[in-house]
UniProtKB/Swiss-Prot annotation:
Function: Receptor for MSH (alpha, beta and gamma) and ACTH. The activity of this receptor is mediated by G proteins which activate adenylate cyclase. Mediates melanogenesis, the production of eumelanin (black/brown) and phaeomelanin (red/yellow), via regulation of cAMP signaling in melanocytes.
Family membership noted in the UniProt record: Belongs to the G-protein coupled receptor 1 family.
Keywords for the protein's UniProt record, in alphabetical order: Cell membrane, G-protein coupled receptor, Glycoprotein, Lipoprotein, Membrane, Palmitate, Receptor, Transducer, Transmembrane, Transmembrane helix
Cellular compartment(s): Cell membrane
Its membrane topology: Multi-pass membrane protein
Gene that encodes the chain: MC1R
Side of membrane Cytoplasmic, spans: 64-72, 141-163, 212-240, 301-317
Protein name per Swiss-Prot or TrEMBL: Melanocyte-stimulating hormone receptor
Organism for this UniProt entry: Chaetodipus penicillatus
């Protein structure tokens, strides 16, 4: 677990302080006086992680409690919340260990710390890969519901959804283990960045197609003035809007980190890139922020889930 600022935290395999990783610590005269470095306190990381942990636990409990939410769409949303939960647990665990080690309250071997760091790295990487996969799965689910509405329930069945979920988790954990084991290979970074861009491209294409179809239907419905169809189409538009918001926030929160990985390969010692590298902790804080925002979007966009969340909160009191 790297212990030096500014890049001492998560995803140690991509951290400049790890042995064998690209040397990214540039001095002030290499980056220039114009270089902006945003420092993120440990307390902020711990607070963000705890907030995200509580929110995503509530989402998982709400979906598990309400039988009306036991559908493929909400199963994928639940797994997305579990991915965010992995981020939260990892953040809280690592920040706590850092504080304990820095305070000298825990004396342990370097090899033990390294093993703990590897476990945290696998958790974070698995959550990253699984988040992308489940966002893609949600987009595909919505696409089928709009363009193959009559066949939707025969195409997207619960058994198929469960098998897809199992496959995604197995693939995410397996690939993350390999990524951490071979962290000092440039191919690892390129694979992660390529997977991120490919998944985003797929989702953008699906969303653009869905929004185009929704716009055509809205125009036709406006001419017919049939309220029943309008309500049904409004439901679909609401779902597409929710997923678009999720995708946009995911891109804004994860984009800087993937740009960071890309620049490690392209310009590891360039002054401008070095300035960007100094803000790794900021990019990681954005990732945690993404895991906080996701449950809020579910609660405000889904009336059924919002009502269940209220019931869960009232029961907890």
């Amino acid at each position: 677990m790297p212990m030096q600022e500014p890049q001492r935290r998560l995803l140690g395999p991509f951290n400049s302080t790890r042995t064998g990783a690209p040397h990214l610590e540039l001095s002030a005269n290499q980056t220039g006086p114009w270089c902006l470095h945003v420092s993120i306190p440990d307390g902020l990381f711990l607070s963000l992680g705890l907030v995200s942990l509580v929110e995503n636990v509530l989402v998982v409990i709400s979906i598990a409690k309400n039988q009306n939410l036991h559908s493929p769409m909400y199963y994928f949303i639940c797994c997305l919340a579990l991915s965010d939960l992995l981020v939260s647990v990892s953040i809280v665990l690592e920040t706590t260990l850092i504080l304990v080690l820095e305070a000298g309250a825990l004396a342990t071997r370097v090899t033990v710390v390294q093993q703990l760091d590897n476990v945290i790295d696998v958790l974070i990487c698995a959550s990253m890969v699984s988040s992308l996969c489940f966002l893609g799965a949600i987009a595909v689910d919505r696409y089928i519901s709009i363009f193959y509405a009559l066949r939707y329930h025969s195409i997207v069945t619960l058994p198929r959804a469960r098998w897809a979920i199992v496959a995604i988790w197995v693939a995410s954990i397996s690939s993350s283990t390999l990524f951490v084991a071979y962290y000092n290979h440039t191919a690892v970074l390129l694979c992660l960045v390529t997977f991120f861009l490919a998944t985003l491209a797929l989702m953008v294409v699906l969303y653009v197609h869905m929004l185009a179809r929704a716009h055509q239907h809205a125009q036709a419905i406006a001419q017919l003035h049939k309220r029943q169809h309008l309500v049904h189409q409004g439901f679909r538009l609401k779902g597409a809007a929710t997923l678009t918001i999720l995708l946009g926030i995911f891109f804004l929160c994860w984009g800087p980190f993937f740009l960071y990985l890309t620049l490690i390969v392209l310009c590891p010692k360039h002054p401008t890139c070095g300035c960007f590298f100094k803000n790794l902790n900021l990019f990681l804080a954005l990732i945690i922020f993404n895991s906080i925002v996701d449950p809020l979007i579910y609660a405000f966009r889904s009336q059924e889930l919002r009502m269940t969340l209220k019931e869960v909160l009232l029961c907890s009191w």
